[in-house]
Amino acid sequence: MALNTGELLFTSSLAELAQSNQAFSLFMMEAFTRHKNLDYGDICDQDKRINEDAVSSGGRIMSSYKLPDELTEHCRDEKIWVITEAENQDGNRLCTTILFPSEY
């Protein structure tokens, strides 16, 4: 089952980094694909259960992916977050945002 993620958004700093660093861009897209396929990355078991409940109840879903060592020197954080907003009243998820934790 793939998650309906709505429109994909990035913070401006992630967009700039993805434009200038192909390896980061690939990592970011791989993280998004994992999130969409319900692989929440580097989160604790409790947060995985919360995400699993949110998939069926329409709540917000959050994943976290640790950057490979070769990318950390280019980034302000050691991971990125992928957040899909909760369903609206029509049952649609309107957007998913990729960001650094420090931008939250």
Model-derived features: where do they sit?
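Short, compact, well-ordered microdomains
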Residues: 61-104
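Compact soluble domain cores
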Residues: 1-70
